[in-house]
Every structure is written in C-alpha cells, then in structure tokens.
UniProtKB/Swiss-Prot annotation:
This is Fructose-1,6-bisphosphatase class 1. Keywords: Carbohydrate metabolism, Cytoplasm, Hydrolase, Magnesium, Metal-binding. Mg(2+) 2 binds at D103, D106, E268. Signal peptide: none annotated. Substrate binds at D106, G107, S108, S109, N196, K262. GO terms for biological process: fructose 1,6-bisphosphate metabolic process; fructose 6-phosphate metabolic process; fructose metabolic process; gluconeogenesis; sucrose biosynthetic process. The gene is fbp. It comes from Shewanella amazonensis (strain ATCC BAA-1098 / SB2B).
Length: 320
C-alpha cells in the first residue's frame, strides 16, 4: 500500500504544502495516542475553562490544541493559525506561506463516553505583509487543502488538495498512514440522514417539512424509507457520508436566538464542504453554497446541509 508520504510526492502540490500536511498528519498520530490513553493518562473531564464560544473546554481540547500549535510553530511555513480553542489568531512564522484553521478535537463531548472524536483542518494561502484576522477571511474555494482525522476503531485521515479525496488508515505496526481508498465518490442518492431530532421544534418550516416527509417513508411523498443516524460529532457523521452516502445537517434553529447556527465556518463547515464537493457531493447553508461564503470573522457560525448531491437538492427545494 502507498504511504501518505509517497502519495503527497506524486501529487501536484508544492513541497512546502506537502511538508505542512505531513506535520499535521504526524501531530494526529500523537493526538490519537492521547485519545486512546484517555483515563489512563488523566486527560478526561473538563479543564475548568471556556473557549471563545462559551463552551466548557475538555482537558483534551486544550492538550490537542497545544500539540497542533507547537507542531505548526516548529514547521516554519505557517504564518498564523486560527483554532476553535483560541480567542484570536496566533501569528507564527513572519514569512510563512500558509494559514491553518483547525478544530483540534471535534465532538469532544464524546470523549468521556469513549465515542468518536476527530481533528478537522483547513489550509489557506497566506497574503504578503502583516497578518491579521482579515487575512483568514477568504471564501472556502480558496482552500489549498483540507481534511480530518477520525479517532475510531482505527485512526483514519481524509484528505483533499483539490484533486479528489483520499482516505488513509494509520497502521499501528509501521506508524505510517497507508492509502486505503483513492478517489472517494459519494453516491448521488441515499436513504440515510443525520440530524439532531431533539431540536425539531426550533427548525425553520422548510427543514421541519423536509424531515417530516423523510420520516413518513414509503407512505409519504418521498415513496421510500429513510434511516436516521446521529453520532454527535461532525467528523463521524461526515465520514459516514463519504463512505456510504447520506445527508448530514445542522440547520438553522431558534433554540438560542443569539446563536441560530451551531457549526463554525472556517474550521468545520469549509473543510468538510471542500471534502464533500471533491467527492461529488454538495454542501449548502440552505440558501447559499458554503464554499462561496465570504467570511465575516474567524469564529463565524453557519447552518450546514451536506452530502449526497440529489438529496441535498431535495432538501434545498423545501427551503426555496
């Protein structure tokens, strides 16, 4: 099997970008170890602090954030980073070529129950001159690379550099990421959807009508049965979509009027949308294509509907 290093050498990307992606992959191996040790290393539970979104930080949120930050600082080609766990951007190499956005541990509420978590990342070109938050506010179409690492029964890396999507599996024997799926393609149609049904009463009328029709199954207007899935970690739900199709959504809701959206654009929605589009799927807020959004700030939140192209189109029909 081809290693990640061999695959990057054969791709059309620059040596500098390949080096950066290698550093991110190597960091994920260390994170995988920390996640697997869990209670044995005393890293479960809350850290006693909140992130910029007002969410309680888990100990592993802080640990994995520092691991990535230290690795990127040492790599030398990253001008600055933005993280879910950092209030502001973190300047690094003054002459760096890249900006990196990441969620160090997506689904961290799953940590204490030993369920799926992951790391999501996005690489953008760095502008010349001084770096600021404005430097990061580029549409998702500008991404040079994006991916996630899923810490599950096996540790897997999903990666795109704009030339399709590859899945790599971490070999615990050699310590290498090995290419296990080349050219991921999401099926156009599906019989699965992923949504947090407990928020149904807070959704917009269009989303309520769409899900109601799915639940009616064969007897309803869709004329077939659908299954619902929900992992409570975007990285896990999107991985399922890449592997066997489906629709994942965290839609607009009125549960907290100050926060109508849940997922962050820069380090959750954009990288996942890039992966999904590169695999033949679609990604939208319900009203605009995610990768075309002009960001207003690094911690901006958006609604997300992504997955099998025909099913996303069907969902969007209820919003229009």
């Amino acid at each position: 099997m081809q290693t990640l290093s061999q695959s990057l050498k054969q791709s059309a990307i620059s040596e500098e970008l390949a080096s950066l992606l290698t550093v991110l992959a190597n960091s994920s191996k260390d994170i995988s170890q920390a996640v697997r040790r869990g209670a044995l290393a005393g890293v479960l539970g809350v850290a006693g602090t909140e992130n910029v979104q007002g969410e309680d930080q888990k100990k592993l949120d802080v640990i994995t954030n520092d691991m990535l930050k230290d690795a990127l600082a040492a790599q030398g080609s990253v001008k600055a980073l933005a993280s879910e766990e950092e209030d502001e951007i973190v300047p690094l190499a003054q002459d760096g070529q890249f900006l990196v956005c990441f969620d160090p541990l997506d689904g961290s509420s799953n940590i204490d129950i030993n369920s799926l978590v992951g790391t999501i990342f996005s690489v953008l070109p760095a502008p010349s001159g001084d770096v600021s938050e404005q430097s990061f506010l580029q549409p998702g179409r500008k991404q040079l690379a994006a991916g996630y690492v899923l810490y599950g029964p096996s540790t897997m890396l999903a990666l795109t550099t704009g030339q399709g999507v590859q899945l790599f599996t971490l070999d615990p024997v050699s310590g290498d990421y090995l290419l296990t799926v080349d050219g991921v393609q999401i099926s156009k149609d599906t019989g699965e959807f992923a949504i947090n049904m407990s928020n149904q009463r807070f959704w917009e009328p269009g989303m309520q009508a769409y899900i109601a029709d799915l639940i009616q199954g064969k007897e309803g207007p869709r004329g077939k049965n659908f299954n619902m899935r929900w992992i409570a970690a975007m990285v896990g739900d999107v991985h399922r979509v890449l592997c066997r199709g489906g629709l994942f959504t965290y839609p607009t809701d009125t549960k907290d009027p100050k926060k109508p959206f849940k997922l962050r654009l820069m380090y959750e929605a954009n990288p996942m949308a890039f992966l999904v589009e590169q695999a033949g799927g679609k990604a939208s807020t319900g009203y605009e294509t995610i990768l075309d959004i002009a960001p207003s700030e690094i911690h901006q939140r958006v609604a997300v509907i992504l997955g099998s192209a025909n099913e996303v189109d069907a969902c969007l029909g209820y919003h229009n």
